[in-house]
A protein has these predicted regions:
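Flavin-dependent oxidoreductase catalytic cores
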Residues: 1-214
C-alpha cells in the first residue's frame, strides 16, 4: 500500500498503530499476551511496528515522508504505559520515522476545550529530535496556540472540529469566532458507515432552515 501511495504521487504515508487497530494491539499489553519475540517487553511489543517501518523505509527511500500515529494510553490500567509508549517512539525514530502523531483512547470522553495529550506530547517533543504532532480535542484556537507556544510540539491535529465546521481554519485566520461549535457529542462517530459522516449540529441547522423557508 505504501508503494502504491508513492506511485500515485502522495508525498508521504502514515502508519496507523492507534485506536486498537491490529498494530496498536501489538503495542499494548492489554491485547498482546505473546511470549515470543513479539511480546513480553516494551521493545518486543514494538517489534512488529518497527519492522514494518524499516521495510517501508527500505522500499521507498530516505526522502519519502513516514509518519507514525500511536496511542499514548489505552484508557485502561492494563494498557500501554508511558514507558512503553516512549520506548516505541524512540525505536520508531531510530527506524527512520519522520514524525510521530500522539493520540489515545480518552478523546471520546473529552468535552472540555483542552488538548487531551498535551502532557505526553510535550514529554515526547523534549525527548525526540523529530517533529511531534498532537491530536485529540482541539476545538479552540487559543488551546492550539497555547500548546505550540509553550512546548516543543510542532503540529496540532484536528478532526471533529473540521466535520462540524469545514471552514474553521478560515474563521480562525480571519480572527472570527475562536471556538468550534463541536461539543464532542460523538454522534459523528456513531453514524453508520453506509452513509456520509456528518455533524448532527449541522443537520439540526439544516432542518431549522428548511422550516424557516417553508
Amino acid at each position: 500500500m505504501a508503494i502504491r501511495a508513492k506511485k500515485a504521487g502522495f508525498d508521504g504515508i502514515e502508519v496507523c498503530a492507534n485506536h486498537h487497530v491490529p498494530l496498536s494491539q501489538f503495542l499494548s499489553p492489554m491485547f498482546n499476551h505473546r511470549t515470543d519475540e513479539y511480546g513480553g517487553s516494551n521493545e518486543n511489543r514494538a517489534r512488529f511496528v518497527i519492522e514494518i517501518i524499516k521495510k517501508i523505509r527500505e522500499k521507498l527511500g530516505n526522502e519519502y515522508i513516514i509518519l507514525l500515529k500511536l496511542n499514548s494510553e489505552d484508557d485502561d490500567p492494563n494498557g500501554i504505559t508511558p514507558e512503553g509508549f516512549i520506548t516505541a517512539c524512540k525505536l520508531a525514530e531510530q527506524a527512520g520515522v519522520d514524525m510521530i502523531e500522539v493520540t489515545g483512547m480518552k478523546w471520546k470522553k473529552n468535552r472540555e476545550n483542552k488538548l487531551v495529550y498535551f502532557d505526553m506530547g510535550k514529554i515526547l517533543a523534549d525527548t525526540l529530535k523529530i517533529p511531534i504532532l498532537v491530536t485529540g480535542g482541539v476545538k479552540n484556537l487559543y488551546v492550539a496556540n497555547d500548546a505550540l507556544n509553550n512546548s516543543n510540539i510542532q503540529y496540532i491535529g484536528i478532526c471533529r472540529a473540521f466535520l462540524s465546521e469545514p471552514d474553521i481554519l478560515v474563521k480562525w485566520k480571519n480572527c472570527e469566532d475562536k471556538k468550534s461549535q463541536c461539543v464532542s457529542c460523538m454522534n459523528c462517530y456513531k453514524i453508520d458507515n453506509s452513509i456520509e459522516i456528518n455533524c448532527i449540529l449541522n443537520k439540526r441547522k439544516k432542518k431549522k432552515n428548511l422550516k424557516k423557508n417553508n
